[in-house]
Amino acid sequence: MSYHDSSDGLLSDHLRYDTRVFPNTRAVTNALLENGLLTQARLILLDSPLMVATAFTALSFQSFTNQHEQGPEKAFQLSWWFWLLMTGLGLGTTVSIKWVGLFTIAWVGSLTLVQLWVLLGDTKNVTPRLWAKHFMARAFALIIIPVGFYMAMFAIHFLCLVNPGDGDGFMSSEFQSTLNSKGMQDVAADVAFGSRVSIRHVNTQGGYLHSHPLMYPTGSKQQQITLYPHKDENNLWLLENQTQPLGINGEQINGTQAWDNLPEPVFIKDGDVVRLYHTPTFRRLHSHDVRPPVTEADWQNEVSAYGYEGFEGDANDLFKIEIVKQKSLSPVSKERLRTIETKFRLVHVMTGCVLFSHKVKLPEWASEQQEVTCARGGTLPNSLWYVEYNEHPQLTGDNVEKVNYRNPGFFGKFWELQKVMWKTNAGLVESHAWDSRPGAWPLLKRGINFWGRDNRQIYLLGNPVVWWSSTLAVVVYVLFKGIATLRWQRNCNDYANTTFKRFDYEIGTAVLGWAFHYFPFYLMDRQLFLHHYFPALYFAVMAFCSTFDFATARISLGGIRNNPVINRVSAVAFLALTIVAFVLFSPLAYGNPWTKAECNRIKVLGSWDFDCNAFHDNVSNIDAFIPGRGMPERGL
């Protein structure tokens, strides 16, 4: 994988060069000497393939644009179709790697709309039928192909990844049931008194109501109740009536097996009061007016397992079944308790609180399992439960109705995974030691510490020459465009000049790409890092290259426009400056030996928080470096 990412880094530079060949740029080499891209390419991270896909998409669309600009009569030829289809393939690849590809789609889409608008106004050469043909071709290539490719990647994903793993807890029970060893046998549909059941939480990735022979260290110090994400015998509960059943002779039948001896099962209905007996530890689900050990809110009560073998229980063991009809699947499941189909709440009879769980982890004394409380409030999804496993001696055989999870199919799994991905990304809101906000990215105010060991450090930081020159190019273009617009309003005929018009379009499209890949991050509250700026940096570098070419082609000051020697010298000087910066900062990219003095010498900004004290005092203290030793395996 590391070799693959390194190859991606080289390939993205090659594609970037090919993209800029069209305006005959002389400064593309700065992309080859970008320390931040190099650092990412050396680690197993998504950003290197993302940059390859972004560069390929930009190259393909630029090539298609060149075909398009040859005129309507050149449309629909083989090369026209090739580059249009390659653009669609690039968009599909980009968005399949990271959702940042949606910004690339927006960039291509906006420029495509401009093309269609211009064609619509060309009534002399473009008939309505021909325009519709252009529209349909672009819709197929730039919408159908990317969407199809994106969905195909998930189809391959589902075919290859058929075993459960650490991440399957994020998915619904229906999704998990399609994984190997996660499926279950058909179980009895109706739930009766005496059923041995496992109860799952609807929200928070569906953990099981669980208990184990460990006590709370505070509060009542009774046995813990938690939410546990895996199947386990400690998830099994026996559903008892609030009173013991009566036999045929009218006498009370005692014991936890009493309901097995009835002539026929008694189904549990909406409003019935039950007790939940934990069969492995002989205790019952219990709640009382005691604060929980972690969430010590007044509206939360502790939930515990209380009692011992042979103990008849007390009133605090009683819970009422409250079926939530709008969440239950079938008409029958709205009236009585049904496996999987019925969604219900467990209301504590004595206090009126509702069995509740949320994404709060208990400490190590509870194996960091999820907290379960009894809440007088809280959101409905966090108090919803359903029965997954259901066993009863009188509900066996082929004549008993059975149920199982429905197979969600490809589209159901695909859509659920999109929602989980969105929710997981949006949930990354906690502060991180190395995060940064978008306002700091264009000026390279802060990097990311990836790894440090043995007086060496890998710290993601871009080449300042590349970053600051590309940011300057964006600022210069904005000022240039503002002045050009004012001159155009005063009837100055700048756009009659072909060179002026051409470079305005080329620089403008690059700056537009930068804007699409940069400004949306201001709307995000999640954790953000410097590497999120890389796609925008790609377009900013393209803007700088075009700006450099435009300046050398248009500026007559000092004979620059007519003197190729000056042009070459300026290009070589910039290249030399870029190389010097690359070499100076390369120890941070490669994790090479370094000294404190060398580190402090290149620390231009105080906000660059790589630790110079981690390096040796002088060269004589640097021992032989073992490549790859202790290298990081984590990403951001």
What do these predicted ranges mean?
Residues 49-76, 90, 104, 115, ...:
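Specific aromatic-rich, kink-prone transmembrane helix
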Residues 14, 41, 75-78, 82-98:
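Membrane-interface alpha helices of multi-pass inner-membrane proteins
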Residues 1-35, 51, 71-82:
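Transmembrane-helix signature of polytopic, membrane-embedded enzymes
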Residues 158-416:
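Lectin-like carbohydrate-binding module/patch detector with strong preference for beta-trefoil
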Residues 105-115, 535-538:
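Hydrophobic transmembrane alpha-helices of multi-pass, membrane-embedded glycosylation machinery
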Residues 433-436, 448-506:
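Membrane-interface anchor segments at the N-terminal boundary of transmembrane helices
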Residues 22-24, 66-68, 78, 83, ...:
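Transmembrane helical bundles and short interhelical boundary loops of multi-pass, membrane-embedded
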Residues 39-50, 97-100:
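Short acidic/glycine- and proline-prone juxtamembrane loop motifs at membrane-interface regions
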